[in-house]
Structure formats: structure tokens, C-alpha cells
UniProtKB/Swiss-Prot annotation:
It comes from Carboxydothermus hydrogenoformans (strain ATCC BAA-161 / DSM 6008 / Z-2901). One of its GO terms (cellular component) is ribosome. PROSITE patterns: RIBOSOMAL_L20. This is Large ribosomal subunit protein bL20. HAMAP family: Ribosomal_bL20. GO terms for molecular function: rRNA binding; structural constituent of ribosome.
Length: 117
């Protein structure tokens, strides 16, 4: 019985990796071994940064809320404490959006927070 060669499977596997490596610089997009290493590293970065993105956005929202709250004479932590005591359940994403796009509504929320401190 002749030896079974895996040329079709190998070609398919190589094409799959090289397709994922498209756009990489130099040998990383041309040579299978180097491309495979870079694709593995890229997938690791993607996995890590999908989690980091959530932290980065939360930091951004908090920074925006803090800046807007300080313009009204309140710190971020005191504002959040006041809103919590008032029973206002609005998340940081929405608060940051209001701080940027609807300053009047944000000012009303600041007043609510001040009353409940």
C-alpha cells in the first residue's frame, strides 16, 4: 500500500494561516512558519485586548463624568454617592454620554446628587 501524502491537507492549512497573516510586514505574511508564529501572537493580543477594551472604556467614562461633575462643583465619587442615595440607576456609559451631549440633563442629575448628599 502506498504512503498517504498529506499535500491537500497541508496546502489547505498553509493557505488558512497565510490568509490570516495577510497585511503583515515582510516575511510574516509570506513564509508559513513565521506567519504561523505571528498569527498565534496576534490572536493572543486580540484575546487580551478584548478584555482590556472594557476597562479602557470604563476609565474614559469615569474621566468624562468627573470632569463634567467638577464643572458643577462636585467630584466624581460624591456625585456617584449622591445618585446612589437618590435611587438613580443610570450607568456610567449613559452618564458620560449625557455629560458630553446633553449638558442640561447632566446638570439636573448633578443637582439631584447634591440634594441627596
Amino acid at each position: 500500500m502506498p504512503r498517504a501524502k498529506s499535500s491537500v491537507v497541508s496546502r489547505k492549512r498553509h493557505k488558512k494561516i497565510l490568509k490570516l497573516a495577510k497585511g503583515y510586514f515582510g516575511a510574516k505574511s509570506k513564509l508559513f512558519r513565521v506567519a504561523k508564529q505571528q498569527v498565534m501572537k496576534s490572536l493572543m493580543y486580540a484575546y487580551r485586548d478584548r478584555r482590556a477594551r472594557k476597562r479602557e472604556f470604563r476609565k474614559l467614562w469615569i474621566t468624562r463624568i468627573n470632569a463634567a461633575a467638577r464643572m458643577h462643583g462636585l467630584t466624581y465619587s460624591r456625585m456617584m454617592n449622591g445618585l446612589k442615595k437618590a435611587g438613580v440607576e443610570i450607568n456610567r456609559k449613559m452618564l458620560a454620554d449625557l455629560a458630553v451631549n446633553d449638558k442640561n440633563a447632566f446638570a439636573e442629575l448633578v443637582e439631584i446628587a447634591k440634594k441627596n448628599l
